[in-house]
């Protein structure tokens, strides 16, 4: 499987770069990760941390997807391209990365 700069693909790397280059944004996502960890619990098949990463990744995907302008505003082609790019992002990988940062030397 081909990767890009250590990430699953270019799209995943790009989202990470944009998050990491803005202190407010990274703080926001680390706080959201902490929240998901705090409300999660061990399940039959997943640990508390795994459960938190799953719900956190879904939250990230929804948050970014909701920010794509309606196709009426930017044209069908461009809306479709944005959705395709966001659909290629490995949200689970990113959620895992920011969950690690949230749990690093911090008592949730």
Where are these regions (language model features)?
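Acidic interaction surfaces
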Residues: 1-108
């Amino acid at each position: 499987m081909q990767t890009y700069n250590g990430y699953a693909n270019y799209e995943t790397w790009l989202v990470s770069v944009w998050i990491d280059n803005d202190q407010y944004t990274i703080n926001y996502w680390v706080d959201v990760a902490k929240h998901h960890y705090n409300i999660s619990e061990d399940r039959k098949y997943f640990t508390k941390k795994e459960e938190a990463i799953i719900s956190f990744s879904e939250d990230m995907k929804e948050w970014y997807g909701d920010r794509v302008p309606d196709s009426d505003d930017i044209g069908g082609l461009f809306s479709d391209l944005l959705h395709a790019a966001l659909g290629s992002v490995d949200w689970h990988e990113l959620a895992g990365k920011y969950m690690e940062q949230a749990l690093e030397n911090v008592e949730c």
